[in-house]
Design a protein with these regions (language model features):
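Short beta-strand segments
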Residues: 23-55, 71
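Short, charged, solvent-exposed linker or helix-capping segments at domain edges/interfaces
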Residues: 99-102, 130-134
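Short, surface-exposed beta-strand-loop junctions and turns on beta-sheet-rich folds
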Residues: 34, 58-60, 135
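Charged, amphipathic alpha-helical segments
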Residues: 11-13, 54-58
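Extreme N-terminal tail/first-helix region
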Residues: 1-21, 139-141
Length: 142
């Protein structure tokens, strides 16, 4: 349980995976030559990895240059918000049997573009936080 003095709590690994699996839109952070690029992607959780589809372009080029990535998703309801961050290595899926496996996840592009490459993020660490909503506590300190 969270009180007003500690509205932020850390999630255990299982809860972080549960929240990650319950969402469909996240943000992929990839290092580029000029900084960190952040891409919104729809995704699916497959075991302890994250899978998304992409097309040729900046996202795939960045992943080929540097496979270390950070992935974030969040969710919220009336009483709390959640943020989950996963870190790992990303690689295009090239094995035919693995492609068939990830195709079965039902990932479809949200926009009408051709995205023929599946990418798997092999998660090496995952963390999450819960933010309990409440009234602005500033009055308490006046």
């Amino acid at each position: 349980m969270t009180n007003i003095d500690s509205p932020v709590t850390y999630l255990d690994t299982d809860k972080a995976w549960d929240i990650l699996a319950s969402q469909r839109l996240g943000r992929l952070g990839v290092q580029s030559d000029v900084g960190v690029d952040i891409f919104p992607v729809n995704y699916a959780v497959d075991g302890e990895s994250i899978v998304f589809r992409t097309a040729e372009g900046a996202k795939l080029t960045s992943l080929c240059s540097n496979s270390l990535v950070t992935f974030e998703t969040d969710s919220w309801n009336e009483i709390a918000g959640y943020s989950v961050v996963a870190k790992g290595h990303a690689a295009p899926v090239t094995d035919e049997a693995e492609i068939a496996q990830v195709e079965a996840l039902g990932l479809r592009p949200w926009v009408p573009t051709v995205k023929t490459t599946f990418v798997r993020i092999y998660v090496t660490s995952i963390s999450g936080r819960k933010f309990s909503f409440g009234q602005d506590p500033i009055e308490k300190y006046r």
